[in-house]
Amino acid sequence: MFSNYKKKKKIYFSKMHGLGNDFMVIESIKQDFILTKSIIENLSNRNTGVGFDQLLLIEKSNNFKFDFHYRIFNANGNEVEQCGNGARCVGLFLFLKGLINKRKIMLSTNKKNISIKFMSDNNIQVNMNEPSFKLEEISISKKIVLNNFSVKLINKNLKCSLVSIGNPHCVIKVESINNAPVKKIGELLEKNSIFPQGINVGFMKVINKNHIQLRVYERDVGETQSCGSGACAAVAVGIAKNLLCDNVKVDLLGGNLIIKWKGFNYPLYMIGTACHIYDGYIYI
C-alpha cells in the first residue's frame, strides 16, 4: 500500500475562494505534473479529495506580452473558457507565492486574455474585456435574436438574454431571488439541445439601477455561492437593456462584487476580494 506513494507525483497547491466559489490553485512553473480528466474529478471530490468548484492551473506563457497562462477546469474535469472569481484568486496566488512583484498582471487564456490589478483597498480588479452579444461567441444550435430569446420549458416559454464573457451565459430576470427556480431551470437549460456545449444560467433581480441580486447555476457544477463571470453577464445584459447604470453592486450568496461597464466598445471591469484558505500537497 505505502509503496504506491513512491510511484505517485507529489504536487503542491493552494485552496482559495472568491466569495465562496472555491478553487484548487496549482502552478506548473516550478513543478512538473500531468493532469487528466479523471485525476481532476478525483481531486474535486469533497469527501476523498481536496474538493472544489474549479481547478485553476497557472502555466508559463509562450507570449512575452503576458506574465502567465491561465486555465480553468470544472469539477467534472471539463476545461472551460473563463472564471472571474478564479482570476482574482490567481492574482492573489501569484502575489503570495512571490511569482509576481507588480500591481498589474497580464494573463493569457484559451479564449480571451485578461488583466488583473491590485487595488489600494485590498480588492482586486479584473479587466474582463468587452462582453459579446454575437452568436458566434455562444455555442447555440439555431439562429436567434439575442435580446428576444425564449425557450420552451415545462410547457411555457421562458424569456432570457444570452451573452458571452469569454464563456456563455443565459440571464433571466426574476421578481424574487429567493424563490427563483435555480436548480430546476438551470438543469433544464444546461442540458437543452439548443446549447450543445452547455450554458451558465443567471437569475437576476433588479433592485435599482445601481444594485442587483443574483444567483447562478454554473455549467457542469450547479449553483455556486458566487460566479464572477455570471455577475459580469447579468450586469452587461442589464446595461444593454437600459435597466442598469454603468456602476453596479451585485449581491451573490457568498458576498458582493462591483461591476463597471461604460457600454459597447468598452471593457467591463469586475472588482472584488480573493481569499487564501490553506496550502497543501497531494499525491496524484
From Swiss-Prot:
The protein, known as: Diaminopimelate epimerase
Organism, as annotated: Buchnera aphidicola subsp. Schizaphis graminum (strain Sg)
Entry keywords, A to Z: Amino-acid biosynthesis, Cytoplasm, Isomerase, Lysine biosynthesis
Matching InterPro entries: DAP_epimerase_AS (IPR018510), DAP_epimerase_DapF (IPR001653)
PANTHER family: DIAMINOPIMELATE EPIMERASE, DIAMINOPIMELATE EPIMERASE, CHLOROPLASTIC
One GO term describing the cellular component: cytosol
Role of this protein: Catalyzes the stereoinversion of LL-2,6-diaminopimelate (L,L-DAP) to meso-diaminopimelate (meso-DAP), a precursor of L-lysine and an essential component of the bacterial peptidoglycan.
Residue numbers binding substrate: N21, Q54, N74, G84, N85, N167, N200, E218, R219, G228, S229
Site (Could be important to modulate the pK values of the two catalytic cysteine residues): H169, E218
Principal cellular location given in the protein's record: cytoplasm
Subcellular location: Cytoplasm
Gene that this polypeptide is encoded by: dapF
Family: Belongs to the diaminopimelate epimerase family.
SUPFAM superfamilies per record: Diaminopimelate epimerase-like (SSF54506)
Enzyme Commission (EC) number: 5.1.1.7
HAMAP family, sorted: DAP_epimerase (MF_00197)
Membrane-spanning parts: none
Catalysis: reaction(s): (2S,6S)-2,6-diaminopimelate = meso-2,6-diaminopimelate
Record lineage: Bacteria, Pseudomonadati, Pseudomonadota, Gammaproteobacteria, Enterobacterales
